[in-house]
A protein has these predicted regions:
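C-terminal motif of bacterial Sec signal peptides marking the signal peptidase cleavage site
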Residues: 17-20
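Bacterial signal peptide processing site
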Residues: 22-24
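Extracytoplasmic small-molecule ligand-binding "clamshell" domains
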Residues: 30-100, 105
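An extracytoplasmic/periplasmic, membrane-proximal ligand-sensing/linker region
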Residues: 32-41, 45-65, 244, 248-302
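Bilobed "Venus flytrap"/periplasmic-binding protein-like clamshell domains
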Residues: 34, 40-63, 74, 115, ...
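Acidic, polar ligand-binding/catalytic clefts
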Residues: 82-150
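A ligand-binding cleft/hinge motif common to bilobed small-molecule-binding domains
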Residues: 93-107, 175-176, 200-201, 205-225
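Short beta-strand->loop
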Residues: 108-130, 185, 218-236
Length: 302
């Protein structure tokens, strides 16, 4: 009996020690201070084009923060979440869906969400700055597709499964009208511009893009609005985030946040950010801003 009591006391002591260590680790786990800031993007356009466009941002950030900055273009959103988890990336320009996945795993915290000019239902850019956007389903005008239910049996061009506007919101919208993943033929395409080109070439019947990705192709495809139509637009989606790895120190969160805010306020900086993602500015964000995204994720995952 005494041996059992001794073992029990020893076990309880061990649990208390480990618990104390865990609390100690947690207390000191948010103290990362980068010596070189690693920033990562996922392309919403041609990745080769984006690689060239991010270099000026690298220089601006380095100047603002006073340390070397290395910018990298990720292959997809899943790779970016993994890079945050493995602490290979400090700052991520990450979609709302990928942010919620990363945050729920404890590997990312949101700093800012982007602002952009509102695009109306005709594809015209207004002068109203908003912190949301929408996803849309686009088809060619010469086909028989007029509403979501018509997509049963169609070949649909979608983005990465963690893309907010290119996968999650359109798939959730389809499920709401009883069109399941098994009811469509999915063609995974990298880049919203490439999806629209595939549609114009007749490689797919419909594509999901952000509203209104067609505007980005008007110069190369002047008839894109004449030849295509949006048959559906989703509810509001919170804009893309600038997030940091989960163990970033509070001081550096503030520094990074202020650096991006300052860059976005200058004409030179605004042009750089517009060229990369169409961002017109930023505002501070909190995790609860993205609860609606979690609801759409859950609907797709069910």
């Amino acid at each position: 009996m005494k041996k059992l009591q001794v073992l029990l006391i020893s076990f309880i002591a061990l649990v208390l020690i480990l618990s104390g260590c865990s609390k100690h680790d947690k207390k000191h786990s948010r103290d990362h201070e980068p010596k070189e800031l690693k920033v990562e993007f996922v392309p919403s356009q041609n990745s080769k084009t984006l690689n060239a466009k991010v270099k000026p941002l690298q220089q601006q950030l380095s100047k603002e923060l006073g340390l070397p900055v290395k910018v990298h273009v990720a292959t997809n959103y899943n790779a970016m979440v993994e890079a945050l988890r493995s602490k290979k990336v400090d700052v991520a320009f990450i979609s709302p869906v990928s942010y919620t996945i990363a945050h729920d795993k404890g590997v990312a915290d949101v700093l800012l969400k982007s602002k952009g000019y509102l695009v109306d239902d005709k594809g015209n850019t207004t002068n109203k700055l908003v912190d949301y956007y929408r996803s849309q389903i686009v088809v060619r005008k010469d086909n028989h597709l007029h509403k979501l239910k018509d997509l049963k049996g169609a070949k649909v061009g979608l983005q990465d499964p963690e893309s907010t506007s290119g996968y999650i919101y359109p798939m959730a919208s389809l499920k709401k009208v009883n069109v399941n993943q098994s009811d469509i033929k999915i063609a995974q395409i990298k880049g919203h511009d490439q999806a629209l080109i595939a549609l114009l070439n007749g490689d797919v019947d419909a594509v999901a893009t952000y509203q209104d990705a067609r505007a980005d192709l008007k110069q190369d495809y002047p008839k894109i609005y004449k030849d295509t139509k949006a048959i559906y637009r989703t509810d509001k989606i919170p804009n893309d985030t600038i997030s940091v790895r989960g163990d970033m120190s509070k001081q550096w969160k503030t520094k990074i946040s202020n650096a991006f805010l300052d860059i976005s306020k200058s004409e030179k900086g605004k042009k750089i950010l517009t060229d990369i993602y169409g961002h017109q500015g930023y505002e501070k964000a909190k995790d609860s801003d993205f609860d609606t995204v979690r609801k759409y994720r859950k609907l797709v995952e069910e």
